[in-house]
Swiss-Prot record:
Belongs to the SNF2/RAD54 helicase family. SWR1 subfamily. Residues 1-53, 185-238, 521-565, 583-614, 645-774, 992-1013, 1545-1576 are annotated as: Disordered. It holds the Pfam family HSA. Residues 529-538, 705-737, 752-763 have a biased composition (Acidic residues). This is Helicase SWR1. The gene is SWR1. ATP binds at residues 806-813.
């Protein structure tokens, strides 16, 4: 008890920071002086020690008062935390010792659990406002230490006294702990004399236990209170001023209730049935305890002598026996009983000692005492035989404990039994030894018998083992030699392959040069034909006859050409160059017919020409012999046999090429249907098909010749004029070009053609003939569009396919329609033509045809399968239609029907969508039966050069030798090696890394290249120039306004920065970015882009509501309040007391007139009545008959008269009172005043309008205060109660209001305010201020609209459009919206309305909303709220505004959030945009390159620096699907609806080819030749096992054995 009390006493000291111990002492009568409380903690040794401690503390203390106070607060805080931990951990502080968990104490070790508890933020002292704001748990340890050190430095700079204060607080804590320990020692040493025990009053035996327990509890409470008061406080008594004060005594009244019987309402329970409860327990004890007296003096503070004496008496007289509590009940032992029990236990322990130690009959077995057992030794382990006849050898059982007295007979029997056991044991041992010896002898002789056989067998096994090891070593050596040989062979083949590739590239460049030279020569030849027309006519007849005569020699020359081509295949590149070095000189002009009798020199020259043509065709024909005959230069016209032979070989070629490129999945058409179609095709094209040589044969030899019916079109067919302006492609104009005579039956047409042939112009670096504008075309063409028509016409005349890659908005559609009109008007080729377009622009193409070329029969192929089948009926008939327009999806779905139809021109719009050459759809379109192909695209490159290769191969595959396409386009690996990898290096070298806000598109990237890089780009331009036409708006339309792009960097708002950093600091985000999973990374990047666009896309602002509690706090006092109100509202006394008689009811006087009351007051006569009453009083007072004598009649009569006088006096007094009461009545207000007020308030007269305007009704007042309520009702309470109205409004009033509301008589005027205060929606202005981009957009739109500009706002996310709508509505801008949900028929109406109405300043659109032909030239500003993943989509959006018809400069603003993922994406996109200038722009082409991004480049965050720099490589074609999966569910649905049209178009091209496609149709998949593919396969196999190729001998040097093995393998004698 003393220990617990001491600890509780210490607790009270620590928990109260400042002690005020002397308040109660002022109440004691002994101490009249008041003690002033002080904050010092005293020592119990006296005031002298206290002074020394204070002086010592003042000397050691160098801190000022505030710092000293701060140290004291830190000490108290640490001890309070210690105390709180004790309470939370142990639920009590009764046994708490502050020294246990103190950090200042050197003797105690702080437990880990307390260390964790004290590190919680609420239990730590913060020196700065921002010292603990940031959570460092997710930061690496190195950064944590750095941040902590920085904080410490800042705190030391801010609080230089921090270390001193902390040290002082530790010293104070140590001093306090020392004082506590000293106080404990003092209490242990103190001795208090016990006082005599207090006799309790008479109690029953049954109540004795209860009273004792109550006394113990009371003593504990008194002791706790005493210890609390006797705490060692530092004395506040100064001997100099309080020397007369010796001691202070005061008493505390005892508790009133010490027994249940002391409670007034307590009654014993009559149903109590316990045995321990008897009748005496119900006896009420009259107990009067003494008051507790406290004594305080200078030496001892707060002592209670009487309680201390009781405690000492109790401890001295307390005895308790040591008994088993489980088997005994609750004993209340007296001293006699205690002594008796102790004596019994002592005797019992003595007996146990005798039995266990002396007699040794008992033993302690664990916790039990048991009888000791007799132990016999185990004789089974006896090793030596014992002599049974010796007494000392006998085994006698040994017993522990008391010796057992056995007889001789007992010993004899035990000895015999022991001897018998020994005998049996010896016998068993002898038998075992005999068996062991026998087995050893047996094994010895067996081993001796088979020793020779065993040795021979072991020798044979050793030989086999050695042989096997030798064989394995030799085999391993041969395997290594085979691997080395294959490796060496692969190296040689790779070197040869590289050499052949370089030679092939040179040949391609020569072919392009020759092709352009031939086109130029042909143009010059056409000019010379105008001057020599009459001569050509005669020459035509001569040449025709000569050709007929020389038919056989021509065939012979063809055969010789085949043989010479076979010889050319055996020659090297240098030999071929030497052989065909004079190819240009061999082409000499000749206007005369060459007969079979010509000179040898001329025939040799002709042979060289034929060989040159043949060699080049073979050179670019995949080493295949061309079966197309090439006419000699001397022949001006083919003979009939030659035409028949050329037509036959041409058909065979077409069949072979279609078979080589066909797909297994596309060969399920019926034979009968194909036959019918072929017959119809032949009938359709009998009059329009021409058998003309194409490719180099057409350029270097004669121009294409038509049939007799189409001979008048020969002049226009010869209109090819592609002449290169490169320095390396110089031409010789002085040379005489060969003339190409032609036969024509219509001289008028020839004259017309000759007039048009004179005009020529330069297009794409080549001179092409200016063709006449077709009369079928309605409208006028711009100059550059007319040039495009000339270029397209030259492609057709030369039999070459091409790509029209003009920038979006330059009119590729009208140029295509002009080409078809030109073919119909000039060449009488009406079709049929197939135009494949995206689904979204099918209607646009049909409208363009009806607008510009209504003479064509256009079949728009769409609808359900039944509708499409109906449209196919009869379409094989001649002139059923001229042009068929369909979509990619339908043309692939019905590819069988389209394959059976023969098409003159197949035109693919938006051809960049067929960039995936591995898909089955690409191969299906490749196998269509078409004579010419034209691709239309605004972006020939989107991602890489391989897509450009895919388009070029689609135009003219390598299997079609009659096409002039080089074989290099069929070899993907070589093309990628030549151009793909160098261009990637160009990007790295030429990226200037500038961060300018304005991008200059006129900057020539090649100016910053070195010579080698410039040559590579020049070669690429040289190869592509004959087949691709690319014009930009800024080049062809000089009067077109400029385009300027600005980068606007937007700072993140506070909320955006918090969400962005919070997402980046998550451990899950770091793991996802480091994992490399493309889908997960894209999901993370999409979330970051949402934060940058608007934080509501990432996390919506919450709607704040109050916590509704069913009851308020005052509800618990409702019952008490109702009782009090009931008594206060009790009106029962009003019936017993008349307030009116007492003149207290002042309200009843309101009807009295004031003037009447004045008149009535004059009637007051109470003074007269009072005089009479006074006289009667005198008479009555003189009377002496208070108690008359009844025997005396006279006295009794006088007494009666006296009583009558008293009655009269009382009546007079009462009359005087009533007179005064009634005459003194004066009204509070008066009747006149009340009537006047009633008159003023009663609506007796109608109110005026002015009065109604001034005095507002409640509804009008609510309406007027609507703005005030809207602005200032913003504070939503945290908690509300539902029953508060019941506490404030009476039930009767509530019922009345409810009835009125039900009858619709009244409305709630506070409804809006209640709603505003109960639920708080986010303010609409936060939509702008939560986002940095919207803040910039608000400023930008304000400036744009003020200057009369109109803007297009593009975004990728559909939800951003919703946010922009809210933003524009808030600012009051008129706008229009276009997304994927807009119908096709409404799209054109919206665009026309926007272009027409200049009052609409803003048009918001989705970048993927479809409608590639949308014209929005009414706007001159484009704002990209967020950039698309693919820059090509953004470029198309720019072209919707910056196109033909725009009259103002176009400014493009791109919003980028700085220091985020968007800035990193923009930096990488600008890097890749340099390819736009390198490959296409400067080579008159273009590209939008979306290179490979790595996670490290995109994130660029210091916290995620451990992310590997690995590029993101998703599955080919699945990027859109991955991006769609990264969207939210709602946003995904909206985006799918918005991009529905684009999805329909894209799904035609995004399908990946299956793995079996390459193996099933090897000829259809472009790639290297057979040998090359074998090399690649073997290379892969070797590379997979390169690590296993570890031969030390081979690395040291090849020995003679290794050389022999390699030669042996090279000769083909080794097989694996």
């Amino acid at each position: 008890m003393a220990r617990g009390g001491s600890r509780r006493r210490n607790t009270s000291v620590i928990s109260t920071q400042k002690i005020e111990p002397s308040n109660e002492s002022t109440k004691a009568p002994e101490g009249p002086q008041k003690r002033k409380p002080k904050t010092e903690i005293p020592n119990s040794n006296g005031n002298g020690v206290i002074k020394k401690e204070i002086k010592k503390r003042k000397l050691d203390n160098e801190l000022d008062e505030s710092q000293e106070h701060l140290a004291q607060l830190i000490t108290d805080f640490n001890l309070s935390v210690n105390e709180l931990f004790q309470l939370k951990e142990y639920k009590t502080i009764a046994y708490w010792n502050p020294d246990d968990f103190s950090r200042a104490s050197s003797t105690s070790q702080v437990p880990e659990i307390f260390d964790l508890f004290s590190k919680e933020p609420e239990y730590q002292i913060s020196w700065g406002a921002d010292s603990n704001e940031q959570d460092l748990s997710n930061i690496p340890l190195r950064l944590q230490k750095k941040i902590i050190n920085e904080r410490e430095q800042k705190l030391l700079e801010k609080f230089p006294f921090k270390e001193k204060v902390l040290k002082r607080s530790r010293d104070l804590e140590i001093e306090l702990l020392q004082n506590i320990r000293q106080s404990k020692k003092t209490l242990e040493k103190s001795h208090i004399k016990p006082s005599p025990p207090v006799k309790p009053s008479k109690t029953s035996k049954g109540n004795q236990k209860i009273i004792k327990k109550k006394q113990v509890v009371k003593q504990e409470e008194e002791e706790a209170q005493e210890n609390h008061q006797n705490e060692e406080y530092e004395s506040d008594m100064d001997e100099g001023t309080h020397y007369k004060l010796k001691a202070v005594k005061y008493s505390i009244p005892p508790p009133i209730v010490t027994h249940p019987s002391h409670i007034p309402s307590w009654v014993p329970d009559p149903n109590h049935t316990e045995s321990s409860f008897n009748s005496k327990d119900s006896e009420i004890i009259d107990y009067h305890p003494d008051a507790i007296q406290f004594v305080s003096n200078s030496k001892t503070t707060y002592t209670t002598p009487n309680i201390q004496a009781k405690i000492q008496n109790f401890l001295a007289s307390y005895k308790s026996a040591i008994i088993d509590e489980t088997s005994s009940g609750d004993f209340n032992n007296t001293l006699e009983e205690y002594e008796k029990i102790m004596t019994q236990q002592e005797q019992f322990i003595k007996k146990l000692y005798e039995k266990t130690s002396i007699e040794k009959r008992l033993e302690l077995n664990g916790e039990k005492i048991e009888r000791r057992k007799t132990v016999l030794p185990h004789s089974s382990n006896t090793k030596q035989a014992v002599d049974p006849f010796r007494s000392h050898g006998a085994i006698i059982p040994k017993t522990q404990g008391v010796t057992i007295h056995s007889t001789h007979h007992d010993y004899f029997l035990s000895h015999g039994m022991a001897f018998s056991r020994l005998h049996q044991q010896m016998r068993r041992q002898h038998q075992l030894r005999t068996k062991k010896i026998t087995q050893m002898i047996e094994q010895h002789f067996k081993k001796k018998k088979g020793e020779k056989e065993r040795l021979a067998k072991e020798k044979e096994q050793n030989l086999k083992r050695i042989s096997k090891m030798a064989v394995q070593a030799v085999k391993k050596r041969w395997i290594q030699a085979s691997k080395v040989y294959r490796f060496l062979q692969l190296q040689k083949e790779e070197e040869l392959k590289k050499i052949k590739g370089r030679e092939h590239l040179s040949q391609m460049l020569e072919h392009s040069t020759q092709l352009l030279e031939a086109q130029f020569n042909k143009s010059s030849r056409d000019i010379s034909e105008v001057d020599t027309e009459n001569e050509n006519e005669t020459d035509d007849h001569l040449s025709s006859s000569s050709d007929e005569d020389s038919g056989s020699p021509q065939n012979a020359r063809d055969d010789s050409n085949v043989n010479m081509d076979e010889n050319d295949m055996q020659l090297t590149v240098e030999e071929l160059r030497a052989k065909y070095a004079d190819i240009d000189q061999s082409i000499e002009p000749s206007s005369k017919t060459i007969s079979s009798d010509s000179s040898n020199h001329e025939s040799d020259s002709d042979d060289e020409d034929i060989d040159a043509n043949k060699g080049l065709v073979a050179l670019y024909g995949n080493n295949a012999v061309s079966v197309e005959p090439v006419s000699s230069l001397a022949a001006t016209e083919y003979t009939d046999e030659q035409k028949t032979l050329i037509e036959k070989f041409s058909k065979e070629d077409e069949g072979i090429s279609s078979e080589s490129v066909s797909d297994d999945s596309l060969n399920d058409s019926s034979s009968s249907e194909s036959d019918d179609d072929s017959e119809v095709d032949e009938s359709n094209h009998k009059q329009v098909d021409s058998t003309k040589p194409t490719g180099l044969a057409a350029l270097l030899g004669n121009g294409p010749t038509e049939d007799e019916e189409d001979s008048n079109d020969d002049v226009s067919a010869d209109s090819d004029g592609n002449v290169s302006d490169d320095e390396n492609m110089s031409t010789t104009d002085e040379e005489d070009e060969p003339k190409t005579p032609k036969s024509s039956e219509d001289p008028k047409m020839d004259e017309k053609e000759n007039e048009s042939d004179v005009l020529e112009e330069e297009v794409n670096g080549s001179k092409v003939r200016d063709v006449p504008l077709p009369p079928l075309l309605r409208g006028t063409l711009r100059p550059y569009q007319k040039q495009g028509l000339n270029w397209l016409a030259s492609l057709y005349n030369n039999g070459t396919n091409g790509i029209l890659a003009d920038e979006m908005g330059l009119g590729k559609t009208i140029q295509t329609i002009s080409l078809l009109a030109y073919l119909a008007a000039e060449h009488h080729i009406w079709g049929p033509h197939l135009i494949v377009v995206p689904t979204s622009v099918m209607l646009n193409w049909e409208m363009e045809f009806k607008k510009f070329a209504p003479g064509f029969k256009v079949l728009t192929y769409y609808g359900s399968p039944q509708q499409r089948a109906q449209k196919r009926k009869g379409w094989n008939k001649p002139n059923a239609f001229h042009v068929c327009i369909t979509s990619y999806q339908l043309v692939v779905h019905d590819h069988q029907s389209f394959k059976r139809r023969r098409w003159r021109y197949m035109i693919l719009d938006e051809a960049h969508n067929i960039k995936n050459f591995r898909s089955a759809r690409w191969r299906a379109l490749l196998n269509f039966n078409t004579e010419n192909r034209l691709l239309l695209t605004g972006t020939p490159l989107q991602n890489n050069l391989m897509e450009l290769w895919s388009l070029l191969y689609f135009l003219m595959p390598s299997s079609k030798v009659n096409q002039a396409m080089p074989d290099g386009f069929a070899n993907l690996e070589d093309f990628q090696t030549w151009f793909g990898r160098p261009v990637d290096k160009i990007l790295e070298k030429t990226s200037n890394g500038t961060s300018s806000d304005v991008i200059d598109e006129n900057d020539k990237t090649t100016q910053r290249m070195d010579e080698e890089t410039r040559n590579t780009v020049s070669r690429l331009h040289q190869v592509l120039r004959p087949y691709l036409l690319r014009r930009l708006k800024k080049d062809v339309e000089k009067q077109m306004p400029g385009k300027y792009e600005h980068i606007i960097y937007c700072r993140l708002s506070k909320r955006q920065r918090y969400l962005y950093d919070d997402f980046m600091s998550r451990a899950q985000t770091k793991e996802t970015l480091a994992s490399g999973n493309f889908l997960s990374i894209i999901n993370c990047l999409m979330q970051l882009r949402k934060v940058c666009n608007h934080p509501d896309l990432f996390e919506v602002r919450p709607i704040v509501t109050s916590l509704a509690m069913p009851r308020c706090v005052a509800n618990s006092f409702a019952s008490t309040d109702s009782v009090v109100r009931k008594y206060l509202n009790d009106d029962s006394f009003k019936g017993q007391v008349s307030l009116k008689a007492l003149n207290l009811d002042i309200t009843s006087l309101d009807q009295l007139n004031y003037f009447t009351s004045q008149t009535t007051s004059k009637l007051k006569s109470s003074s007269e009545l009072d005089k009479q009453a006074d006289k009667l009083n005198e008479l009555i007072s003189a009377s002496e008959y208070d108690q008359p004598n009844l025997d005396n009649f006279l006295e009794y009569y006088k007494f009666i008269k006296s009583n009558e006088q008293v009655g009269i006096r009382d009546n007079l007094k009462h009359a005087s009172y009533l007179n005064s009461l009634r005459c003194d009545r004066i009204p509070l207000l008066g009747e006149s005043v009340i009537k006047f007020l009633q008159t003023a308030t009663q609506p007796r007269q109608p109110f005026t309008d002015a009065y109604n305007d001034i005095i507002l009704s409640i509804p009008k007042r609510v309406e007027k205060m609507d703005d005030v309520i809207e602005k200032y009702s913003v504070l939503t309470p945290s908690v509300v109660t539902l029953d508060l109205k019941d506490q404030l409004i009476p039930l009767s009033t509530q019922r009345t209001i409810m009835n009125e509301v039900a009858n619709k008589n009244i409305d709630n005027p506070f409804h809006k305010s209640q709603v505003k205060l109960s639920i708080a929606f986010p303010d609409k202005s936060l939509l702008q201020f939560d986002c940095g981009k919207l803040q910039k957009l608000a400023t930008l739109l304000q400036d744009l609209t003020a200057n009369g500009h109109r803007a297009l706002i593009f975004t990728q996310m559909t939800k951003v459009l919703d946010i922009l709508e809210q933003f524009l509505n808030i600012h009051g801008y008129r706008y229009m919206r276009l997304d994927g949900a807009t119908k096709i028929e409404d799209r054109q109406l919206l665009t026309e309305k926007f272009n027409r109405d200049s009052k609409i300043p803003v048009f918001i659109l989705s970048t993927r909303s479809g409608g590639l032909g949308i014209n929005l030239t009414g706007a001159d500003t484009v704002i990209f709220y967020d950039s698309d993943w693919n820059p090509a989509m953004d470029k198309q959006c720019q072209d919707r505004c910056h196109r033909i018809g725009q009259s103002r400069d176009v400014h493009i603003y791109r919003f980028v959030s700085e220091y985020t993922i968007e800035s990193n994406i923009l930096r990488k996109a600008n890097q890749k945009r340099q390819l736009d200038n390198v490959v296409i722009q400067e080579g008159e082409f273009t590209t939008d390159y979306f290179g490979k991004f790595s996670v490290k480049d995109l994130v660029n965050d210091a916290e995620v620096a451990d992310i590997p720099d690995k590029p993101l490589e998703p599955a080919y074609g699945n990027v859109e699907n991955v991006l769609a999966q990264a969207e939210d569910e709602d946003d995904r649905v909206a985006a799918n609806a918005a991009m529905k049209e684009v999805a329909i178009d894209d799904e035609d091209f995004d399908e990946e080819s299956k793995a079996a496609t390459n193996t099933a149709t090897p000829s259809q998949t472009p790639g290297p030749d057979t040998a090359g593919s074998g090399i690649v396969d073997s290379t892969v196999k070797i590379n997979n096992k390169t690590d296993s190729l570890e031969d030390v001998d081979y690395e040291d040097g090849v020995s003679h054995v290794d050389e022999y093995m390699l030669r042996f393998i090279a000769n083909g004698y080794y097989w694996d």
